[in-house]
Amino acid sequence: MEKIPIRPFSDPASIISLCRCTLENSNAPLSLLCSATNKFILSARDSADLNEKGDFMNIFKPISYIASLAPREVTLLALV
């Protein structure tokens, strides 16, 4: 499985980092993200999460929301 370059964070204003991962088992990377990001990550999975220019909006989504999508491939934004 591809390593996901995410570090724990405490400051929500930290720099946003984009990482792409192909999910072989959607639970495995989500578990890693859950511990790495204090239970929250930023998601741009839905088109509603993009502004008019196509830029990612800073919308916090819980891990359970991402898990419910269960896509084969998902773009994840995480604070680092």
UniProtKB/Swiss-Prot annotation:
> Which superkingdom does the taxonomy of this entry point to?
Bacteria
**Induction profile:** The YbiX-S short isoform is expressed in both exponential and stationary phase in rich medium; expression is higher during exponential phase (at protein level). The YbiX long isoform seems only to be expressed in exponential phase at low levels (at protein level).
Additional remarks: Encoded antisense to waaL; both isoforms are encoded within the waaL gene.
Q: What is this protein called?
A: Protein YibX
Organism, per UniProt?
Answer: Escherichia coli (strain K12)
Its organism's taxonomic lineage begins at: Bacteria, Pseudomonadati, Pseudomonadota, Gammaproteobacteria, Enterobacterales
